């Protein structure tokens, strides 16, 4: 999951190199582009691709650049031979400074050639954009990390901190083998770090080449799927009875639809609403500031709730996503069921949300069962000045006038597993997306050429700021 672009600014816009005529790529950018191209053109979907092959290809490049086998760790399990990954270790000079971990998932969402304007597994460059599945989510980040370590190796760079890189599979598919989860449970030594840099942050553009905001993801919601089910004896449809499984389920779903979880704020979301609201300068922005000051302000809440992202960022949400019922057109239903997908605000257990659903439904005939996978719900990482400070300084350098706004994701990433393992994980600023979402998880996914190249420079500078 790449960042769901936050509605940070609307009134202000800051020109970046993307707003100008496309410059000719530098020689180092062309080398990087080749790595990016190879990753995009290696199909890593769960159905027909191989993360293992992509990881092996990156390891081959790194070995050719001088990395010894002892610093390259390919991994896969016998049960999931195509869902492997790569951990690379670039040693630092200090024995006291803890390592940093840079990470990216290399699996991608399914993409059907018939639905796309171009082959999703061929890299195309057109009209200032790169097109292909994974261009923004998130093989761009994986390519940056591989290219960065290769350049460090070739230049003989000697950081104080050891830099670790993890390219993993399984982030995009619920229930699939997850490389970060496996590493945390089985090879913690390979990824142990003071903190990790992940996807989830990033910038917003106005869609015309102007970057209008940069954020760092600090924490995310966890999720749970619940199966609601009702059962009745059934019978012939010519003789309806009061107890009808479909009607009972429909009543339960209506109660969930009408239920609004209360407004809540963490330190991160309070700061997000205050700072992003101040930057907007419109009615929604003023309401955001008011809510940051007083979460009980109902008038402000009503204005903010009109934005689906902001509404969800304030609370737990539960929504029906799948529905089934009945067994024959001329029979009373014996069973009806629905999936309820909940995105749970930090500080709440999954069990407490299940109990809340039962209370809202108020019908003991409706059973509620949590479905796999079951993910951990770690606390948000701290707003550590040692982590946030370098981001702020570099954002000010690259995009004068912009600040880094901390945010909480309504979705989730592999940071869940690292956070549960005690490694604070941050979704970094840098690359930016357009207001329409750039086709992430959808058709014709793309990233602006300058978003990739400028974001790459920013990300490498950020790692060096931490490593030095």
Q: What do the PLM-derived regions correspond to, one by one?
A:
Residues 5, 81-83, 97, 118, ...:
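Short, solvent-exposed loop/turn segments at the edges of secondary structure
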Residues 5-16:
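Bacterial N-terminal signal peptides
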Residues 21, 61, 201-457, 466-467:
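Metal-dependent amide/peptide-bond hydrolase catalytic core
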Residues 25-33, 44-55, 81, 135-138, ...:
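Solvent-exposed, acidic/flexible segments
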Residues 129-130, 136-215:
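Acidic/histidine-rich catalytic neighborhood of metal-dependent amide-processing enzymes
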Residues 45-47, 79-81, 93-95, 106-110, ...:
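Solvent-exposed loop/turn segments at secondary-structure junctions
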Residues 126-137, 404-405, 447:
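Short pre-catalytic strand/loop immediately N-terminal to key active-site residues, enriched for Gly-Thr
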Residues 22-133, 142, 152-161, 340:
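Acidic/His- and Gly-rich active-site-bordering loop/insert found
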């Amino acid at each position: 999951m790449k960042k769901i672009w936050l509605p940070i600014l609307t009134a202000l816009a800051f020109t970046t190199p993307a707003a100008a005529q496309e410059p000719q790529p530098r020689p180092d950018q062309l080398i990087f582009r080749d790595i990016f191209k190879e990753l995009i053109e290696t199909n890593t979907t769960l159905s027909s691709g191989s993360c293992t092959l992509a990881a092996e290809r990156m390891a081959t490049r790194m070995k050719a650049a001088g990395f010894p086998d002892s610093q390259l760790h390919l991994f896969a399990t016998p049960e999931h031979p195509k869902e492997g990954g790569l951990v690379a270790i670039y040693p630092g000079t200090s024995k006291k400074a803890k390592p940093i971990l840079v990470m990216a998932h290399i699996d991608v969402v399914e993409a059907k050639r018939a639905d796309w304007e171009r082959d999703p597994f061929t890299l195309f460059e057109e009209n200032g954009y790169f097109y292909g599945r994974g261009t923004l989510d998130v093989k761009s980040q994986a390519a940056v990390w591989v290219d960065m370590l290769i350049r460090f190796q070739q230049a003989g760079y000697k950081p104080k901190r050891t830099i670790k890189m993890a390219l993993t599979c399984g982030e995009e598919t619920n229930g699939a083998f997850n490389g970060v989860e496996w590493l945390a449970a089985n090879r913690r030594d390979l990824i142990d770090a003071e903190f990790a840099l992940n996807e989830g942050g990033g910038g917003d553009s106005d869609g015309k080449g102007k970057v209008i905001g940069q954020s760092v993801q600090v924490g995310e919601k966890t999720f749970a799927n619940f199966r609601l089910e009702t059962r009745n004896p059934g019978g012939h449809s010519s003789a309806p009875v009061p107890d009808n499984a479909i009607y009972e389920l429909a009543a339960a779903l209506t109660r969930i639809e009408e239920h609004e979880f209360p407004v809540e704020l963490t330190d991160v979301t309070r700061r997000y609403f205050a700072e992003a609201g101040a930057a907007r300068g419109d009615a929604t922005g003023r309401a955001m500031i008011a809510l940051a000051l007083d979460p009980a302000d109902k008038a402000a809440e009503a204005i903010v709730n009109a934005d689906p992202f902001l509404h969800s960022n304030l609370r737990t949400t539960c929504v029906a996503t799948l529905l089934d019922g009945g067994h024959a057109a001329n029979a009373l239903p014996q069973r009806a069921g629905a999936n309820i997908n909940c995105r749970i605000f930090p500080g709440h257990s999954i069990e407490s949300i299940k109990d809340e659903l039962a209370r809202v439904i108020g019908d003991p005939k409706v059973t509620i069962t949590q479905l796999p996978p079951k993910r951990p719900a770690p606390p948000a990482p701290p707003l550590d000045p040692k982590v946030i400070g370098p981001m702020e300084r570099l954002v000010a350098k690259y995009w004068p006038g912009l600040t880094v706004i901390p945010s909480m994701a309504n979705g989730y990433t592999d940071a869940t597993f690292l956070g549960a393992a005690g490694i604070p994980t941050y979704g970094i600023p840098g690359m930016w997306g357009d207001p329409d979402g750039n086709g992430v998880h959808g058709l014709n996914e793309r990233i602006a050429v300058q978003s990739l190249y400028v974001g790459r420079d920013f990300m490498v500078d950020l790692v060096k700021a931490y490593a030095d």
